[in-house]
Amino acid sequence: MTTRVDAGPGGGGCPDIFDGRENAGVLLSRLDRFNQRHPWSHNDHYSPWVVGQVAASGARDVLDIGCGTGNLVARLRDIATTVTALEPDAATVRVAAQRFAGDPAVTIVEADFAGRDHQRRWDAVILLAVLHHLPLVPTLRELRDCLVPGGRLVVVGCYRGAGLVDMLADLPAMVANPVMGMIKHPARVDTLPPHMTAPTAEPKDTLADIRAAAALELPGARIRRRLFWRYTLVYDAPSEPGGDSAN
């Protein structure tokens, strides 16, 4: 049973957050079928917000982890001097590489986060529906170390729903998701667009887990629950090594 998947009802790397709630199975199954027929990208929905966060930081050299086919890269290209984009999926990265072939400001690398240039630091690092594919605590620690002094980390992530609060918080999304599908993709389809076919993963960490890990590894990080089963995290590194965060 699925309430939504990242490559279906609203693509972006985040499959079900409530599993096994069979009492609502019939309704959720119908919603899922409808969403699959009218797909739209949650990632694209949040991309303007991400770009705004990066632009506000004044970042010039940007790292996009898990770039997919490059929709966010295209937006970042308008505000950054250089964009380095990592994507581990071979089929997806080919699309991105072809898209930006000949653009000296964009570097597309077929690699996951572990395959980045470990000697390099960036003004801004972005993960859009990617963090839940990675081990939470060590990844946050490494992300912090990827930033130059004063650099900014921007995350739009997925969390595992747990308890009544999460379930109630997700009710508006369950209603809004099919409405957005009809607005953004009114024509019924049988196959997903290419930018919504990247591999998915189930979120393992709850929002409480994420808040606790961020408090430990990214002191001062700002975390907010968002619509469509998402949260956002913004962290500004200290301007000087060993100093306090700019948050």
Sequence positions of predicted segments:
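A conserved beta-strand element that flanks and buttresses the S-adenosyl-L-methionine
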Residues: I126
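Short glycine-dipeptide loop
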Residues: L147-R152
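Conserved alpha-helix/loop element of class I SAM-dependent methyltransferases that forms part
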Residues: S41-R60
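A short, conserved alpha-helix within the catalytic core of class I
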Residues: L134-L143
